[in-house]
Amino acid sequence: MLNKTFSNLIDSIRLLFRKDKESYLCFYRMLGFYPRDIRFYEQALLHKSFSVKLEQGGLLNNERLEFLGDAILDAVVGDIVYQNFEGKREGFMTNTRSKIVSRESLNHVAEQIGLSKLIKFTIRNSAHNSNLGGNAFEALIGAIYLDRGYAYCKYFMENRIIGQYIDLKKISRKEVNFKSKL
C-alpha cells in the first residue's frame, strides 16, 4: 500500500496551488488525508432536501454515495472485526459489526467528527433530521471509496474512528436485542 505520509506530503504541496484550500483543509482535519477529488466529499454533504439540479437532468445529492458507503462500511467493519476477534464465531462477529454500523453509532460518530455540522439540508422537521449524520457518514465512506479506494476507507475507520470514537471491546460486549428494534 502507498505510504500515506508520502502521499499526504505530495497532496499538501498540490494544495498550495488550489483556490479552495479551506474545503481541503476541513476534510483533511476530519479524515487524516487530503481528498484528491473534493467533489465526492462535497456531494456527501448534500442531503436530498438540498439537491442540486444537473444540466443534463436529474438531481445531485448524497443518496447514491450513501448507498455505496453503506456497502463499503459493512465490508470494512467486517474486515476489522474479523481481524480483531480471532477465533470468534460468525454470529458474534455479525452482531459486533451490526452494532458498529448501527444508525445510533454512526449518528454519534458523525457528531463527534464534526460531520453533522457540515451537512446541507432544508428540512426543519426534527423527525427527518435524526439520521442525517449517520446517512452523511455512510455517504462520506462512499466518497472516500470513489476518491481513494478500499484501503483508505479501512485506514480512516481504523485510525480515525475505531479507538477514538468506537471501543471495539466495549461495543462487542454491549447487549442489543435486534428483534425488539423491528
Located regions from the model:
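Double-stranded RNA-binding/processing signature
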Residues: M1-L182
